[in-house]
C-alpha cells in the first residue's frame, strides 16, 4: 500500500495547535512554528478554498419561532375500544359486558362459568362451589347443595353474623332467692305485677310482700261484699222463692262469686315470696 493512502485527508491544513499536521516527508520539525490556515470563506488566496463544493445554506432552528408545537396524541391500539370489560373470576379472561349491565351475572365465553357484575339482591349472597359453579342463596343459609349432577357437593357456610360482633350486654335486673326451692335466679321485669316464675322449679312466687297483700285485701273485701249481697238477696226474696224458681239461681251465683273471691284472697295470702338479694344497674 502506498504511503499516500496512509496520510490523513487535507494534510496541508492545521488547527493552530499542531493537530492534524501533515505526516509526509516534507513536514516541518516539531520545534518549528506551523502556519495558520485562513478561515473558511475569508480573505486569502483563492487556492486555499476548496473547489467544486457549494456553499452551505444558513442553519435554521428545528422549531419555527412563533409556531406552537404539534398537539400530543397518545398512541392507541386499533384493537382497543371503549366497551366495558371485566375479568372472569374463574379463568381470568376478559368478558365484554356491553349491553349486559342490567344483569347480575354474565357468562364467560371461554370457561362457560358465571361471574357476578353486581351485588347480590337484598337478603342474598353469592357462593362459588369448588366445581366453579356460582350459587346464590340466602344470607342466613348455613348449608347449600350444588345443583350440578356430577358434583352434588354439600357446602357448609358456617354461622352468619348479621352485624358487627359486640360484647354481650351486662345483665340488668334483680337477683332473687326463690321462695319455693331457695335457688337464685335473675328477674328483669319491673312492674306492679311482680310475679316471677323460677327457672329451676317452674313455680310462681311474688317479688316482695306488697303486691300479694294488696291483692289479698281486695279479694277478701270483694268476697265479703258479695256475701253480704247474697245474704240480703236471700232474706228479701225468701217468700218469693217458692213461686219463682229463678231466684234460687241468683242466690247460687252470688254465693259462688263470694266464695271465689274469698278463695282467691286465701291464694294471695298463701303466696310464697321471693326476696331480692342483689341488683344490677
Curated annotation (Swiss-Prot):
InterPro entries: PtdIns-P2-Ptase. Keywords: Endosome, Hydrolase, Lipid metabolism, Lysosome, Membrane, Transmembrane, Transmembrane helix. Residues 14-23 have a biased composition (Gly residues). One of its GO terms (biological process) is phosphatidylinositol dephosphorylation. It is a multi-pass membrane protein. Pfam families: Tmemb_55A. Catalyzes the hydrolysis of phosphatidylinositol-4,5-bisphosphate (PtdIns-4,5-P2) to phosphatidylinositol-4-phosphate (PtdIns-4-P). This is Type 1 phosphatidylinositol 4,5-bisphosphate 4-phosphatase. It comes from Xenopus laevis.
Amino acid at each position: 500500500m502506498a504511503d499516500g493512502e496512509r496520510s490523513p485527508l487535507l494534510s496541508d491544513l492545521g488547527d493552530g495547535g499542531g493537530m492534524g499536521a501533515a505526516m509526509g516527508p516534507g513536514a516541518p520539525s516539531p520545534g518549528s512554528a506551523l502556519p495558520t490556515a485562513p478561515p473558511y470563506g475569508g480573505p486569502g488566496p483563492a487556492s486555499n478554498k476548496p473547489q467544486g463544493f457549494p456553499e452551505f445554506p444558513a442553519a435554521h432552528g428545528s422549531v419555527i419561532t412563533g409556531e406552537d408545537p404539534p398537539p400530543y396524541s397518545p398512541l392507541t391500539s386499533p384493537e382497543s375500544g371503549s366497551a366495558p370489560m371485566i375479568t372472569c373470576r374463574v379463568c381470568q379472561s376478559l368478558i365484554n359486558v356491553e349491553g349486559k349491565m342490567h344483569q347480575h351475572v354474565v357468562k364467560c365465553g371461554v370457561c362457560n362459568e358465571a361471574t357476578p357484575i353486581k351485588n347480590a339482591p337484598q337478603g342474598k349472597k353469592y357462593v362459588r362451589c369448588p366445581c366453579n359453579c356460582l350459587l346464590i342463596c340466602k344470607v342466613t343459609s348455613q348449608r347449600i347443595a350444588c345443583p350440578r349432577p356430577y358434583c352434588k357437593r354439600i357446602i357448609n357456610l358456617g354461622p352468619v353474623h348479621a352485624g358487627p360482633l359486640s360484647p354481650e350486654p351486662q345483665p340488668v335486673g334483680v337477683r332473687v332467692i326463690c321462695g319455693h326451692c331457695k335457688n337464685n335466679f335473675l328477674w328483669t321485669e319491673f312492674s306492679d305485677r311482680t310475679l316471677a316464675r323460677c327457672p329451676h322449679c317452674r313455680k310462681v312466687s311474688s317479688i316482695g310482700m306488697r303486691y300479694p297483700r294488696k291483692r289479698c285485701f281486695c279479694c277478701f273485701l270483694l268476697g265479703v261484699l258479695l256475701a253480704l249481697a247474697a245474704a240480703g238477696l236471700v232474706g228479701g226474696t225468701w217468700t218469693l222463692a217458692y213461686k219463682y224458681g229463678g231466684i234460687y239461681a241468683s242466690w247460687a251465683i252470688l254465693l259462688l262469686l263470694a266464695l271465689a273471691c274469698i278463695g282467691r284472697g286465701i291464694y294471695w295470702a298463701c303466696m310464697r315470696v321471693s326476696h331480692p338479694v342483689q341488683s344490677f344497674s
